[in-house]
Amino acid sequence: MLKVKKARYHGIKLPELSIGLDYSDADVQHIFVSHAHADHIPRNRKSLREHTNLAIYATPPTAALMRLRGFKEDIIELPFFETLTTDLFTMTLYPAGHILGSAMAFIETGVGNILYTGDCKTP
């Protein structure tokens, strides 16, 4: 079973996979940013810069908005419907409809799958 920990503010952490979903602490190696609102962009930028093997994922519009807000760290841009594959998981992003570039992440692992919606538009 996939373990999920709720973050203190927004987001969740998947500790077994070292993934933060709208969550950024020094104890994760992968961060997914669902959209470019300030409450979802990684907060502790100093710890991010000191992180040596950190991967930050976002859609191209979200990455562009983050850069406009002064975000200097490298961001791996993952377009909607394309799948990223790592040794531990695959991740595919789908439109969330909240703001430009907002995404839901479908993460598949050997121990379970999760759809992280972040903020999304409902009918």
What label would you give each PLM region?
Residues L2-D27, A38-P123:
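His/Asp/Glu-rich metal-coordinating catalytic cores
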Residues I31:
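Hydrophobic beta-strand segment of the Class I
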Residues H35:
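Conserved G/P- and acidic residue-centered "switch" motifs that form tight phosphate/ATP-binding loops
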